[in-house]
């Protein structure tokens, strides 16, 4: 019966009463991916990965483990540049992974369609920004991808990146007693030398090497190390036998060199990329708004003297007086505020660092005015306003301005406010509104 239903679903009949499978998007050894229409009113189309249980069983325990690992990894990840897993369905003979649709195809195909097979450096910066933002997020949650390559980087309808295929991902329980990984996996042309030599390795540092290869491909249009003999390719990688074209800038060359360092101990980590001059420019507010909006972005977030709070504002912060009920539920989900004694510069710096991990970027008031209605293709923009409580204390108000999923709530219901609070730390957040269930926060201040 289940097998009959699965076969019928391919002909247009509803899949378990929830989805209608359409055209075939792609196929692998053990899976087929279909374009599908959700039967829920107003829902976006999805991609459904169909796996045959008997085929998985015949392939041995390794393939089934890979599927389980992929599901486990994707379920703990929710980032604008990570392909989202909506749900997992199953019948007696099939497993269905219902995922976000990425109609733009993969990055390799997109590059292959270009005459030069490469991107201009400013465009490569934007692509690399999204890739690294996704991997910083994954690593912060204990997930090492281990197969980062252009084929596993998909594009949505607006050209935004979606990291996919977590079948080889390593989770915290994959680590041995020495705290390292020992399974050699991935695609040789993008795998780190220590992985190819079957040594114990750090998954995040291995992903950093793969990022270096991808950056090289984006800038040069070809692989840095390309040899059918894996031993020879590994030897070239250790000797750094690669050559970037003359048009690549010096900052970009230095970044590639730091990432394609055969010594993992001195190799630049993904989380450290924000400090590199070439990448720091693309992480700036100016670069992000310029590439995303196509206009003239703000040159900086001006640190003007925050306006003082009036008497009503201060009274509303008093212990025992909670005015949150005066505001709608949607507003409470979209807006948070906290008290800080940190400087404005320090506060914005920490918010920006947290954004690289959590998938948002900061904008000023002028930047908010230029944001297109409906958000930035899933990216989340956050605006901030500071008000002076006392000469040494400020109230910081945060508001989600982008990432609308179509419900008018800007993705606020799913935004990780608690994660943001943890990233900012107690040295920045003195008291936080809306996270303690109305209990008194530190220093006796209730917001």
UniProtKB/Swiss-Prot annotation:
Molecular-function GO terms, alphabetical: ATP binding; protein serine kinase activity; protein serine/threonine kinase activity
Induction description: By salt stress and abscisic acid (ABA).
Highest taxon in the source lineage: Eukaryota
Positions of ATP binding: 25-33, 49
BP terms from Gene Ontology: signal transduction
Region (Activation loop): 165-194
Top-level EC class: transferase
Keywords: ATP-binding, Kinase, Manganese, Nucleotide-binding, Serine/threonine-protein kinase, Transferase
Location of the active site: 147 (proton acceptor)
Residue ranges of the region described as PPI: 333-362
Domain NAF: 297-328
Domain Protein kinase intervals: 19-279
Cofactor(s), by name: Mn(2+)
The reaction(s) this protein catalyses: L-seryl-[protein] + ATP = O-phospho-L-seryl-[protein] + ADP + H(+); L-threonyl-[protein] + ATP = O-phospho-L-threonyl-[protein] + ADP + H(+)
Enzyme Commission number: 2.7.11.1
Biological function: CIPK serine-threonine protein kinases interact with CBL proteins. Binding of a CBL protein to the regulatory NAF domain of CIPK protein lead to the activation of the kinase in a calcium-dependent manner.
Domain notes: The activation loop within the kinase domain is the target of phosphorylation/activation by upstream protein kinases. The PPI motif mediates the interaction with the ABI (abscisic acid-insensitive) phosphatases.
Family: Belongs to the protein kinase superfamily. CAMK Ser/Thr protein kinase family. SNF1 subfamily.
Record protein name field: CBL-interacting protein kinase 7
Organism, as annotated: Oryza sativa subsp. japonica (Rice)
Gene (UniProt): CIPK7
């Amino acid at each position: 019966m289940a097998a009959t239903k699965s076969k019928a679903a391919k002909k247009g009949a509803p899949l378990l009463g929830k989805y209608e499978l359409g055209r075939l998007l792609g196929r692998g050894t053990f899976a087929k991916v279909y374009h599908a229409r959700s039967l829920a009113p107003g829902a976006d189309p999805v991609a459904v990965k169909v796996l045959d249980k008997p085929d998985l069983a015949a392939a041995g325990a390794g393939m089934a483990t890979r599927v389980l690992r992929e599901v486990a990894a994707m379920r703990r990840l929710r980032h604008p540049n990570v392909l989202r897993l909506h749900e997992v369905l199953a019948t007696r003979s099939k497993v269905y992974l219902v995922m976000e649709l990425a109609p733009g195809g993969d990055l390799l195909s997109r590059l292959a369609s270009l005459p030069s097979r490469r991107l201009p450096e400013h465009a490569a910066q934007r692509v690399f920004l999204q890739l690294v933002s996704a991997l910083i997020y994954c690593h912060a949650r204990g997930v090492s991808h281990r197969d980062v390559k252009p084929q596993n980087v998909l594009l949505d309808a607006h050209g935004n990146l979606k990291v996919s295929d977590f079948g080889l991902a390593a989770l915290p329980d994959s680590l041995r007693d020495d705290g390292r990984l020992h399974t050699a996996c991935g695609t040789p042309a993008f795998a780190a030398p220590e992985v190819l030599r079957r040594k114990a390795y750090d998954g995040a540092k291995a992903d950093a090497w793969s990022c270096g290869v991808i950056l090289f491909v984006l800038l040069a249009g070809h692989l840095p190390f390309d040899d059918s003999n894996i031993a020879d390719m590994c030897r070239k990688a250790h000797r750094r036998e690669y050559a970037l074209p003359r048009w690549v800038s010096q900052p970009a060359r230095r970044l590639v060199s730091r990432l394609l360092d055969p010594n993992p101990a001195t190799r630049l980590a993904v989380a450290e990329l924000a400090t590199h001059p070439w990448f720091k420019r693309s992480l700036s507010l100016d670069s992000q708004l310029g590439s995303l909006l196509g206009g003239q972005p703000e040159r900086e977030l001006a640190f003007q003297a925050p306006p003082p709070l009036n008497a009503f504002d201060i009274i509303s912060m008093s212990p025992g007086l909670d005015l949150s009920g005066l505001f709608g539920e949607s507003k409470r989900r979209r807006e948070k505020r906290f008290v800080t004694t940190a400087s404005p510069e320090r506060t914005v710096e920490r918010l920006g660092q947290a954004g690289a991990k959590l998938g948002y970027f900061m904008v000023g008031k002028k930047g908010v005015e230029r944001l297109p209605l409906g958000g930035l293709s899933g990216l989340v923009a956050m605006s901030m306003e500071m008000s002076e409580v006392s000469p040494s204390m400020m109230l910081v108000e945060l508001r989600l301005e982008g990432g609308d999923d179509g419900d008018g709530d800007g993705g606020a219901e799913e935004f990780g406010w608690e994660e943001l609070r943890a990233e900012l730390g107690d040295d920045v957040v003195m008291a936080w509104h809306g996270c303690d269930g109305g209990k008194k926060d530190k220093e006796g201040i209730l917001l």
